Amino acid sequence: MPAGMSDAAGKTLADFKAPYPEPTSQQRRYVIFLDPKGDSKELNDYKVELIPGRVEKVDGTNVYRMGGNIEERTIDGWGYPYYIVTLTTMSGTLMMPLGDAALKRPRFVAMNTKNLYRYNSRLPIVVYMPKDGELRYRIWTVKSTGSGTAKSTKAREM
């Protein structure tokens, strides 16, 4: 394997031969392939945070959040999970922006989520998003008792 390449690089959803549903005309399907870490570490030391959202034109002063829901479903007869995201309205704080901060620019506005999902390199994480949505995710790692770190990544559409 070339240096810098992950074990997950180059995988496709078809490699898993599971009947994941096709996205509807109003959806995009994102697929996340995770690198193997070892069964015990995956179970105890790693978690995945899904960060759905949408790029919106917003000012640089206020804090914005997207409303919505993440629903977990399973493939009948297989037990493989997949997720359907619904995005609703955006809300923000009401501070008065001044100067350059008042300029509206395209920025990713994340849905407020609190769930962490099991890290399992044997199965892809399949997420169906609205067409105008975007999915990012974080891999959380335990460093020691009571502390951890996270690395954010943009998910791949398939």
UniProtKB/Swiss-Prot annotation:
Q: What is the lineage of its organism?
A: Eukaryota, Discoba, Euglenozoa, Kinetoplastea, Metakinetoplastina
Molecular functions (GO terms): serine-type endopeptidase inhibitor activity
Q: Name one Pfam family in it.
A: Ecotin
Family annotation (Gene3D superfamilies): Ecotin (2.60.40.550)
Q: What is this protein called?
A: Ecotin-like protein 2
What GO biological process terms are annotated to this protein in UniProt? Answer: symbiont-mediated suppression of host complement activation
Q: What is the species listed in this Swiss-Prot or TrEMBL entry?
A: Leishmania major
Q: To which protein family does this belong?
A: Belongs to the protease inhibitor I11 (ecotin) family.
